[in-house]
Amino acid sequence: MSSSRPVFRSRWLPYLLVAPQLIITVIFFIWPAGEALWYSLQSVDPFGFSSQFVGLDNFVALFHDSYYIDSFWTTIKFSTFVTVSGLLVSLFFAALVEYIVRGSRFYQTLMLLPYAVAPAVAAVLWIFLFNPGRGLITHFLAEFGYDWNHAQNSGQAMFLVVFASVWKQISYNFLFFYAALQSIPRSLIEAAAIDGVGPIRRFFKIALPLIAPVSFFLLVVNLVYAFFDTFPVIDAATSGGPVQAITTLIYKIYREGFTGLDLASSAAQSVVLMFLVIVLTVVQFRYVESKVRYQ
């Protein structure tokens, strides 16, 4: 059986339909990326009026900067905490839906609410709750003799931004995990239950392998989220402190480019971060899409 391929009457119509997206891509992605690559090879004055080609000197200076290396490892640590915690917590809440008999719709709606909150608003919300002097959570912590002050304790500051970032991303992960779990044929679960397999073993032996593609997809998405979209949380909650302990790569780019006016160094850092994101994207399409197989 042959199928005819639809043909546009005007050969310009397909190009006209994709033109808006192409224009947006060029203006907001390709052009800024090209500008960053160009400035990363220049020595630029603080106002961007004059520049001099210096080749890879900015990158060499970058990797000899101890503060940049520290921010790199901070980003790795922060991204790992956010990604692993976010995926595990979201998967746990998605798996609980099966065991909630009453109020499941309310539970699902409640899980989706954080996604509607802006990242900066989420940070401010948890700042109020963790306020050293008047916060509700810090009040209960003080009852147990624990002194909380994230403005002076780098470990507490890291916990705060990780907690707020994970809370903000739970809804997104929950939605995908819930859809993936619901797509599993019930006959497999029921057959395993009849054979005497317990719920925990059913989850790890049946459900978890079947949702592996979604899990790997969310792994890449959450890593990119931790690299980029957590900037408002870090800025509103800690401003990268204390003592630059929460200064990630994206926040260091902002601080040096917009506050320190070091455009060349900021551009070089942007190129490095762009390279990392490209690597993550390649991993997604080359590994996630091709290596995950059902047996």
From Swiss-Prot:
Function comment: Part of the ABC transporter complex UgpBAEC involved in sn-glycerol-3-phosphate (G3P) import. Probably responsible for the translocation of the substrate across the membrane.
Major localisation: membrane
Domain ABC transmembrane type-1 intervals: 76-284
Cytoplasmic topological domain: 1-11, 102-109, 178-207, 284-295
Pfam families: BPD_transp_1 (PF00528)
Ranges facing Periplasmic side: 33-80, 131-156, 229-262
A GO BP entry: transmembrane transport
Subcellular location(s) per record: Cell inner membrane
Listed name of the protein: sn-glycerol-3-phosphate transport system permease protein UgpA
The organism of origin for this protein: Shigella dysenteriae serotype 1 (strain Sd197)
Phylogenetic classification of the source organism: Bacteria, Pseudomonadati, Pseudomonadota, Gammaproteobacteria, Enterobacterales
Domain of life: Bacteria
GO CC terms: plasma membrane
Record carries keyword Membrane: yes
Transmembrane intervals: 12-32, 81-101, 110-130, 157-177, 208-228, 263-283
Subunit structure, as described in the record: The complex is composed of two ATP-binding proteins (UgpC), two transmembrane proteins (UgpA and UgpE) and a solute-binding protein (UgpB).
Keywords tagged on the record: Cell inner membrane, Cell membrane, Membrane, Transmembrane, Transmembrane helix, Transport
PROSITE patterns found in the cross-reference section: ABC_TM1
Family: Belongs to the binding-protein-dependent transport system permease family. UgpAE subfamily.
